[in-house]
Amino acid sequence: MAVKIRLKRMGAKKTPFYRVVVADSRSPRDGRFIEEIGTYNPVAQPAEVKINEEAALKWLGNGAKPSDTVRNLFSNQGIMEKFHLSKQGK
């Protein structure tokens, strides 16, 4: 089972709100997911990002692939850097 970390769209029309979820890559964008690890609100100024860092690092360590947008969110939060450092054993 290929697992991805991606955004699940919520909110009303023209006011998107996203949940950062871990899901099977074959399931639909807003369909079944394994675990919710955070939220992302692009409408707020500045954009609000809340991510459970421990859960994100756990899933990255287990081989989950983040989508491009989620990878950018993780990089801005410093999660990707921590993941790469832990991979190198530092």
Curated annotation (Swiss-Prot):
InterPro entries: Ribosomal_bS16, Ribosomal_bS16_CS, Ribosomal_bS16_dom_sf. GO terms for biological process: translation. Pfam families: Ribosomal_S16 (PF00886). This is Small ribosomal subunit protein bS16. It comes from the Bacteria. Belongs to the bacterial ribosomal protein bS16 family. Keywords: Ribonucleoprotein, Ribosomal protein. The gene is rpsP. SUPFAM superfamilies: Ribosomal protein S16. PROSITE patterns: RIBOSOMAL_S16. The keyword Nucleus does not apply. The keyword Ribosomal protein applies. It comes from Bacillus cereus (strain ATCC 14579 / DSM 31 / CCUG 7414 / JCM 2152 / NBRC 15305 / NCIMB 9373 / NCTC 2599 / NRRL B-3711). GO terms for cellular component: cytoplasm; small ribosomal subunit. GO terms for molecular function: structural constituent of ribosome.
